Amino acid sequence: ETLERVIPLLEAVLRRTAYLVLLSENPQALEQLIKLCSASSWVAEYITRTPLLLDELLVPETLYRLPDQHELQEELHLRLLRIEADDLEQQMEQTRQFVRAHKLRAAACEVMNKLPLMKISDYLTRLAETTMTMVQNLAFEQMVAKYGYPTDANKEPVYTPEFLIVGYGKVGGLELSYSSDLDLVFIHHGHPGGSTTGERSLDNGVFYTRMGQRMVHFCSTQTRSGDLYEVDLRLRPSGNSGMIVASLKAFKEYQQNHAWTWEHQALVRARVISGSSELSSSFNDIRQEILTSQRDIPELREEVRAMRQKMRDNLGSKDTNGQQFHLKQDEGGIVDIEFLVQYGVLAWSHQHPELTQVTDNMRLLDALTKAGLMAPKDCQTLQETYLSYRAETHRRALQKQSLLLESDSVSALGFDARRNDVTRLWKLWLEPEQS
């Protein structure tokens, strides 16, 4: 099996003499390569697509050490410093190489059991935050070079972008994996009557909308190293029919008057990943206000249940007579735990506003327990189950396997009992009339 994984890689390497020389002169790198390819088909394919990553194998001490956020920022800054300000193609390529190198490091640490799952997810999330902050800064600089600076109410130029990147889903919940999309919402707070200072002047709102479009283009363009991240903006106000970049005022108005319950559920995991502290604070105030609104509990339960059933019908395992279990979408799986937590936050934040202070499921479960809303034993059960499920999703991602488990795998992993535990607690919280 290892040989099957390594052969395509060797074929890719044979096309470039430099890589052959690198491996022949660095037996340690070759040893690391074989180890990693043996452990993960994803790693083997990842390096095959980008043989430049072989450089990462030269120093095991570096390969198995994940830098902190400040070090990531410094490295990306230095990579881009060498590139002309108007060389977009090279900026995109260097940013992709940076992300790929660090994803490889994370995968190496995971498959060699150097770090636990939550450290890996935190790192992949920090990597995305660092990268998207740089993408935002580059897009702003390029827009300013073309159209000048946006202006405030006094027609004075605004030198830092009044722009937020809000992370939802896995990036908001600090749970990124190797191939995760980034669920993002872009928000601006440009003065509504203002326009830019350049000769080719733009309305402030149009300036920020084009800046958002530029950021998506930067991420999605296929270069030699592929795309950067797949950015999903469907959680923005009005979804696909909404503006790519919403004003802060429009975002607030939508959340207050037009958002569905599932959009408020999504807001539970939303957090700012890039933007000014002042604007971040304004967003957090809106989020807090929405999440702590008093809700009709039976109506909320019904809406959460209906949305969950719709997802199971569309995304879960079908026609398998219980012989398969979709780890994420089926009853007793990952999404049941996520919905259960989101229901708890929406139901009780009115009395317990501290529930809105964190966005990841592990700490949200702790917060629900600390508030006396969940039994400590149930919290422990859900946390252990959630971590077990997520560890298996990571393992399967690194082996390029589906999240659809056969019944023998479910039993071997001990997931039968875990599913039953989740289903029991789901019924306790969301179907109390049937419990």
What are these regions (language model features)?
Residues 1-435:
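A nucleotide- and high-energy phosphate-metabolite-utilizing enzyme signature
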